[in-house]
């Protein structure tokens, strides 16, 4: 199931402003790769480039043997890129069940079901299946957003700040879920995060960004280095 995701020398502009400068990231198969940095350095723009929401002006993104530069978001999703956006973006008026079923869009009829392991990872989703998404707490909505992405059967799971504004107990649940997906499902995971302890605990590889550029990459243990942390201090 593991598939590599390779970002090679991409540039991205918003009008005349350059947001990303020659960004290169390799997400090795079956590993968790974390991208860190202060607010506004281009982390989320990088993820939106991967998913096709933002269009790059130079470089290439490859997913296994497929090149993605011209592929629209729906095609990337069908190839196996699952996305959990910042802010969760669940549908508040739909039930938990209906929110999960929105992940069916790109699936064949035979695959249109919610894999049992999603409810094992996030039992609250099963117990609140018929409740509206808007009734869930922020942490529960994040679990729902991750569950919805997993319904699409991704080979690579991309998450934008999955711990933002969430209580510590649910952060631990999310961390355990991502480790399960890596260790038991062989999933490749790319996440943007500012919570250093979370990344130190679950990430295999890190990339540190500043002003739209990669300043450092290496193992998660490098987060203890002073020259790395200087790019993360507010």
What function would you assign to each model-found segment?
Residues 36-38:
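The feature captures the beta-strand-to-loop junction immediately N-terminal to the Walker
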Residues 132-136, 140:
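Conserved ABC ATPase signature
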């Amino acid at each position: 199931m593991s598939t590599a995701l390779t970002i090679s020398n991409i540039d991205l502009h918003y009008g005349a402003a350059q947001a990303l400068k020659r960004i290169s990231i390799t997400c090795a198969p079956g590993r968790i790769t974390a991208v860190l940095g202060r607010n506004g350095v281009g982390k989320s723009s990088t993820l939106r480039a991967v998913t096709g929401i933002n269009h790059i002006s130079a470089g290439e993104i490859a997913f296994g043997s497929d090149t993605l530069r011209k592929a629209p978001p729906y095609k990337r999703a069908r190839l196996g890129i699952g996305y959990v956006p910042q802010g969760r973006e669940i549908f508040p008026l739909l039930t938990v069940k209906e929110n999960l079923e929105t992940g069916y869009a790109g699936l064949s009829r035979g695959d249109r079901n919610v894999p049992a392991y999603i409810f094992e990872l996030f039992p609250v989703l099963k117990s609140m299946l018929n409740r509206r998404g808007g009734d869930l707490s922020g942490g529960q909505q994040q679990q729902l957003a991750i569950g919805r992405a997993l319904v699409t059967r991704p080979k690579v799971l991309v998450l934008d700040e999955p711990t933002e504004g969430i209580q510590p107990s649910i952060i631990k649940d999310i961390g355990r879920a991502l480790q399960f997906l890596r260790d038991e499902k062989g999933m490749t995971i790319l996440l943007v995060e500012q919570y250093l302890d979370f990344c130190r605990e679950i990430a295999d590889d890190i990339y540190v960004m500043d002003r739209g550029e990669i300043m450092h990459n290496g193992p998660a243990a490098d987060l203890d280095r002073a020259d790395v942390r200087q790019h993360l201090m507010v």
